[in-house]
Every structure is written in structure tokens, then in C-alpha cells.
Amino acid sequence: MMKIEKSSQPKENRPYGLWPSPISPELISQAIRLQDLQWAGTGSTLVWSESHSGKGRLLAKPDGEAPYTLSGTLNVKAGIGYGGGEFSAGENCVIFAEKDGRLYRRSYGAGKPMPITPAFGCSAAPALSPDGKWVLFVHTYEDQDVLGFVDAVGNLWPEKLVSGADFYMQPVWSPKGKAIAWVEWDHPNMPWDGTRL
């Protein structure tokens, strides 16, 4: 049987929140927040987003190599609602949302991010097609959300695919790229109250 010894220290009562803590606001502000992890292509490269001091960046870690930054000096951040849906990792490239509202493409390895959408409104939740040629995304402009699509290299003007709902989120492609799905809902509902798939 284990013997438990009583402490010689007097018992101290303090109100909630007044105990000294090693966790300070300064420590929290220095933390790096990991936000999403995706395998690129055949699963040989891990891609993730992280946030530090309010700035988001996108990193890649190929198998057997050191991690490197994909986003350069850009601030990776989805600009719709509470954010989320910041990037889509494909076989040869990644598509990501930047704080300026545009979507950018970056090939793995050497290179720099290139915009694929114009600078108006805000974009989020990019979804790269299985063949890597098209991108679905959520876009908002003047308080109107739509589901849009654009070619993955930005040669064509983005087009509105679906509109009419108040909010859209999480567009995805079928495995063969022949169909798409998304979630939508209207005021006054929240996503957990009343959505359509």
C-alpha cells in the first residue's frame, strides 16, 4: 500500500483566475498555430498552413527533405466569414487564398506564387480538380456569396457557378472530377441548424 504524506504547507484558497500561471499572454502570442494538413498528390509531400502573430504562411515538406515556405511573403488567409479553407494541395501545385482576397497558385519546388483570380472581393475554400486543371472556390463580393470556378493557371476570367444561397462552404470534386458537391445555407440559420448539400 502506498503511503501519502501530508504537505507541511498551509492550504491556500484563492479565487478562480488568481492563481499564478506559467502560461502568459506573451507566451500565447508567440505560439505557432497549425491550421490544416494535406498530402499532396501521391502522398510524398505534406503541405500545411500555420499562423504566427496574425500572419499565415504555407509550408511543404517533401519526403526526406527539409520543409520550405510555399507562400513567400504573402499572408495565407481565407477572407470569408471566420476563414478556413485556405488551400488545396494537388499533385504538382497548391492553390491558396491570400489576405488580399485573391487565389494564388504555387508549384512545388522552385518558383513563386502567381495570382489566378483578380483582386476584387474575397476568396476561400479552393478545391483543385483531380486532374489539376480547375479550381472551385467560395467567393464573396458586396455581401453576396457565390460558388465560382477558374482554370488552375489563371488564364481565364473566373466564372460564377452557383448563386442564390446566403452562404457556401467546402466545395469538393468527385474522385474522377465528373461531379461536385458543396454545403449551402441561408439566414437566419447557422451551418449546424439548417444546411443543404
Each PLM stretch: what is its role?
Residues 47-71:
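Short N-terminal amphipathic alpha-helices
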Residues 3-33, 62-82, 106-122, 148-169, ...:
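Multi-bladed beta-propeller domains
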Residues 29-45, 74-93, 120-135, 165-180:
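Conserved beta-propeller blade repeats
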Residues 42, 54, 90-91, 97-100, ...:
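Short loop/turn segments that connect beta-strands within the blades of beta-propeller domains
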Residues 4-9, 39, 45-47:
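N-terminal presequences and immediately downstream first alpha-helices
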Residues 50-58, 75-81, 95-104, 118-123, ...:
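A flexible loop/linker signature enriched in serine peptidases of the S9 family
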Residues 43, 154-155, 178, 190-191:
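Short, solvent-exposed loop/turn segments that connect beta-strands within catalytic domains
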